[in-house]
Amino acid sequence: MANTVYDDSLGTSSLAYRIDGGDDELGLTGLFWLGGFKSAMTGTKGEAMADLARATRRRSLRFDYSGHGESAGLFTDGTITLWLEQSVHMFLRHTKGKRVIVGSSMGGWLALLIVKRLQAEDPSAFRRISGLVLIAPATDMTQDLMWDEFGENEKQELAETGAYVRPSGYGEPYVITAKLLADGQKHLILKQPLHLPFPVRILQGTDDTDVPVSHAIKTFDMLTGPDITLSLIKGGDHRLSTPAQIQLIQETVLNLVNRADGVSF
């Protein structure tokens, strides 16, 4: 079990992270895990990626965004801009060599934003990305899955108080701030094509009420490239955390890292 260590170099929040698996010196393609909104790196899927890394002796990095898990900061201070900057920072500072990025829910959106940023600003880092696995990607969630879905009461509460307390089917209610929604406007990407030269795998449950199948199809349609697939998991909800679903996620990730390593089947 990896110990939690902290990165204080950003100067904004102390970010908790864990490194699992083997050493980069082995030359195997590693993993970079991005969790979801209000999720911790020690959740079921984050642990599954760590287990896969250990079993295959490859390096895996996972971390908590500020206001999440073991990281410092208030959740209500978070924005997509802030969490994106933290994600890019962790990728550049704590990974080397080839990586497959695995993003769940909001982490899927952040994965696409990282790719877009590096493609434009850091081609050498972009070339290290060997593939994406997007699990129920909540692309443009602040607009499509939050604001556009809110009724007049929710919008009035946001206007009057600057926040809306949203019930959660997974635990305590969470606070959605007007600041988060406004900031999200800077990062909307669904309306313009994004070309990716590496394999992309989207995994989506058919019974997901948080990120519906229709939204996953929007992400799929927005992406262009030689090897992009969308797989529907019948009966799967947003968590995709049953043993069979976790095994499917691990097998999907393993397929991409093996391909990047030049392993033939």
Name the predicted role of every residue range.
Residues 27-36:
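Short beta-strand element of the alpha/beta-hydrolase
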Residues 38, 65-69, 139, 237:
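Alpha/beta-hydrolase active-site loop signature
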Residues 50-72:
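Conserved alpha/beta-hydrolase
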Residues 125-233, 237-265:
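The alpha/beta-hydrolase serine catalytic core
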